[in-house]
Swiss-Prot record:
Biased composition (Basic and acidic residues): 98-129
A GO CC annotation given for this chain: cytosolic large ribosomal subunit
Family matches, as SUPFAM superfamilies: Glucocorticoid receptor-like (DNA-binding domain)
Family: Belongs to the eukaryotic ribosomal protein eL24 family.
BP GO annotations: cytoplasmic translation
Alphabetized GO MF terms: mRNA binding; structural constituent of ribosome
One Pfam short name: Ribosomal_L24e
Region feature Disordered, mapped onto this chain: 98-155
UniProtKB keywords: Ribonucleoprotein, Ribosomal protein
Name the UniProt record assigns to this protein: Large ribosomal subunit protein eL24
């Protein structure tokens, strides 16, 4: 025995009961009684008609099983060693007090500045040494000699 379901109310339709409505696009609707057929034809929303199965389902009426809450995974940051720094070194640097960290940063900046100054002085000295060894600069044009103008000849 095949039991159909009412397209509007969701009620069971036993064999020999109910009516069939075929829409223009060949979609079939089954109704258990004229009440649900009438409401369907009035274009009523079954979720808003209090006695329908859809209404009860939509408004969580009747018996419902407790659905276990969906657990979401929480991301936890894991500290790993990177190239050039071991895990111990990273942890040690992180645990430094801000004052100590600032002092270290200032010392490093000062040392870098001094190194840069020394490099610049060394480069300047090297340049001066090269200039002294080369002597006075002579341009290529001067080395070749000035352009000689050819004297015009006439007949």
């Amino acid at each position: 025995m095949k039991v159909e379901i009412d397209s509007f109310s969701g009620a069971k339709i036993y064999p020999g009961r109910g009516t069939l409505f075929v829409r223009g696009d060949s979609k079939i609707f089954r109704f258990q009684n004229s009440k649900s057929a009438s409401l369907f034809k009035q274009r009523k929303n079954p979720r808003r008609v209090a006695w329908t199965v859809l209404y009860r389902r939509h408004h969580k009426k009747g018996i419902t099983e407790e659905v276990a809450k969906k657990r979401s995974r929480k991301t936890v940051k894991a500290q790993r060693a990177i190239v050039g720094a071991s895990l111990e070194l990273i942890k040690e640097r992180r645990s430094l007090k801000p004052e100590v960290r600032k002092a270290k940063r200032d010392d490093k900046a000062k040392a870098d500045k001094e190194k840069k100054k020394a490099d610049k002085a060394a480069r300047k000295a090297e340049k001066a040494k090269l200039a002294a060894a080369q002597g006075s600069k002579v341009s290529k044009q001067q080395a070749k000699g000035a352009f000689q103008k050819v004297a015009a000849t006439s007949r």
